[in-house]
Design a protein with these regions (language model features):
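Enzymes that bind and transform nitrogen-containing heteroaromatic metabolites
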Residues: 1-123
């Protein structure tokens, strides 16, 4: 996740928001207040490539559009959750100039609340 996603939780006392997962925060100037959170101060693309070479499950990206845009070349699967209400505006999934990227719908689930979860894979 990016620093902008991580810091609001820290201000509320949540220093390890995903304690069941390996946690990484991309930031050039952050010192982690929690030993379970790793800070990536270098190139996030190279860090993700290194993580992808490690054994284990996938990588889940939580955060804003700038980090997602920088990592788009490394994103193999995109999971979008659509909620049945209109907010008016919000944070974009990808922020900045990105190359057109073709995806194929791999799965759709509709929850009892009416929310839908769409999973897309790279073509």
């Amino acid at each position: 996740m990016g620093r902008g996603t991580y810091e609001p939780g820290v201000r509320e006392g949540v220093t390890s928001p995903y304690s069941h997962l390996g946690q990484y925060v991309v930031s050039g100037g952050l010192t982690s207040p929690d030993p379970a959170v790793n800070v990536i101060s270098g190139d996030p693309v190279e860090a993700v490539r290194a993580l992808k070479r490690e054994p284990g499950g996938g990588i889940w990206l939580a955060g804003g559009g700038r980090l997602a845009a920088s990592l788009l070349p490394e994103i193999d699967e995109l999971v979008l959750k659509i909620y049945p209400f209109v907010l008016g505006k919000g944070i974009g999934v990808f922020d900045g100039d990105i190359a057109p990227t073709h995806l194929a719908l791999a799965d759709t689930r509709v929850l009892g609340s009416g929310a839908a979860i769409h999973t897309y894979a790279r073509k």
